[in-house]
């Protein structure tokens, strides 16, 4: 499989994150992103509707293909079936009630809408780190902690100055190719408060945040069972997305791992509910898989077919 390198973040369109990647010496804009809907603001009245109807949305079914895809991505194509079976018990450990429990905290009023650099966002970060500690999932040794500080100088926003913030990183080392890194990411910031109203960000991107956390738990369970990932996995929670992908940009320019060893990034954003045109469907928008590599698209399709058979919607899968 050819190597694909993440080198910098560039632009935003309808909730998607774009990353500049280089494949040998050819540059193109790309991201493999899983999205479900594109509404940004999620005030309290919608937050309670979201929680009330959570079970109906079957969120756990969205995450399973992502998990399976990553495992299969670590394997030779002729061994996809075996590895899928080996990981089945781990990905089945992802439960809707666990996702809901974490989301109720991440998107609670106590977190004050998780504005970049705010005390509420920092509280959310502490909760996430405690979660990883309880799982036994550590941070990258080279970093020395779960925090990658993002200084205010790197958080220049058109909306005004922002204080220092942090990306949060957790890490599971691979068994056969530990030097090669797969990144699973989501942004954990939101838009804060406005006129005393908390914009909880349950969907944007509380849903992606708790997905990454639960995926980490599944991989850790697989590792304990002797079926850990062959490549290393970095669970990356970025800050400053709402102000222009600033945390993603900072990590791209200050990577913890050499970018030439980063073989893929799967980003998860707003997978908590459907949009109007897809109401009632079990679907997910997939963005960038074929542009990134034909192998990644084939693996994603095969993993989905073998697990939950979601509708893979490529409506927003374009290079511009």
Over which residues does each language-model region extend?
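Second-shell loop/turn segments in exported
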Residues: 84-93, 109-119, 155-158, 196-205, ...
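Structural recognition of the beta-strand scaffold that forms the well-ordered cores
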Residues: 104-107, 169, 181-185, 234-237, ...
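Metal-dependent peptidase/peptidase-like ectodomains
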Residues: 238-320
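Cationic, amphipathic, low-complexity segments that mediate targeting or membrane/lipid association
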Residues: 1-51
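N-terminal capping segment at the start of a domain
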Residues: 82-88, 92-123, 135, 139-141, ...
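Alpha-helical metal-binding/catalytic segments enriched in His/Glu/Asp
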Residues: 168, 184-243
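C-terminal motif of bacterial Sec signal peptides marking the signal peptidase cleavage site
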Residues: 73-74
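A non-catalytic alpha/beta surface segment that caps or lines the substrate-entry region
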Residues: 114-172
């Amino acid at each position: 499989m050819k190597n694909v390198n993440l080198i910098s973040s560039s632009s935003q369109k309808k909730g998607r994150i774009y990353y500049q990647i280089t494949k040998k010496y050819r540059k193109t804009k790309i991201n493999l992103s899983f999205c479900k809907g594109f509404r940004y603001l999620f005030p309290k009245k919608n937050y309670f509707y979201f929680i009330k109807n959570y079970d109906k949305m079957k969120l756990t079914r969205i995450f399973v293909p992502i998990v399976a895809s990553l495992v299969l991505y670590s394997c030779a194509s002729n061994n996809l079936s075996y590895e899928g079976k080996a990981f089945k018990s781990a990905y089945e450990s992802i439960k809707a009630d666990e996702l809901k429990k974490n989301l109720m905290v991440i998107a609670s009023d106590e977190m004050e809408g998780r504005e970049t650099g705010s005390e509420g966002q920092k509280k959310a970060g502490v909760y996430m780190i405690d979660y990883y500690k309880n799982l036994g999932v550590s941070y990258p040794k080279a970093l020395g902690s779960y925090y990658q500080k993002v200084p205010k100088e790197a958080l220049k926003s058109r909306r005004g100055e922002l204080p220092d913030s942090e990306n949060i990183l957790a890490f599971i080392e691979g068994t056969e190719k530990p030097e090669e890194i797969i990144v699973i990411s989501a942004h954990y910031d939101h838009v804060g408060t406005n006129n005393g109203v908390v914009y909880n960000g349950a969907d944007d991107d509380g849903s992606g945040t708790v997905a990454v956390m639960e995926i980490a738990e599944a991989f850790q369970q697989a590792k304990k069972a002797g079926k850990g990932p062959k490549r290393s996995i970095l669970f990356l929670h970025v800050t400053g997305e709402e102000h222009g992908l600033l945390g993603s940009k900072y990590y791209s320019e200050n990577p913890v791992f050499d970018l030439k060893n980063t073989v893929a990034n799967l980003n998860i954003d707003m997978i908590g509910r459907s949009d109007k045109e897809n109401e009632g469907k079990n679907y997910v928008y997939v963005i960038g898989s074929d542009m990134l590599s034909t192998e990644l698209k084939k693996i994603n399709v095969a993993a989905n077919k073998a697990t939950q058979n979601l509708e893979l919607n490529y409506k927003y899968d374009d290079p511009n």
